[in-house]
Amino acid sequence: YAAFDVANHFWEWCGGLDDSATPRFERYPSEATRRDWVEALLGGVAEPAAVDRFCRAVDVFAPLDHLFWGLWAVTQAAALGRSTGFRYLLYASHRLSHPSVAEAVGRAI
């Protein structure tokens, strides 16, 4: 899904992509910045309604991105432990502790 990839891209703006850095979630782009970015992604010719739909999809996938990569890190910790030198469980903690994850799970159940 393109919207999932874009949500992941925006979270990467926050850093914390390695095991030693704490993500700075305040770096997540504002709604206006996200909209401008999506308009550019769609070539600047998309109808405003199409941009709105894509932005809403990005917002839906944003917490799922944390869930996906957090669970990925847990499985990597179980499979690899510390053999790679990467602290998977710390990374998982960073991703899974974001408030949007609990909100998304709460809406789903």
Task: Show the residue positions of the predicted features.
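Active-site activation/catalytic loop segments of kinase-like enzymes and analogous catalytic loops
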Residues: 3-48, 63-82, 98
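Acidic, serine/threonine- and proline-rich low-complexity regulatory regions
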Residues: 47-60
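Regulatory N- and C-terminal appendages and interdomain linkers associated
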Residues: 71, 76, 80-109
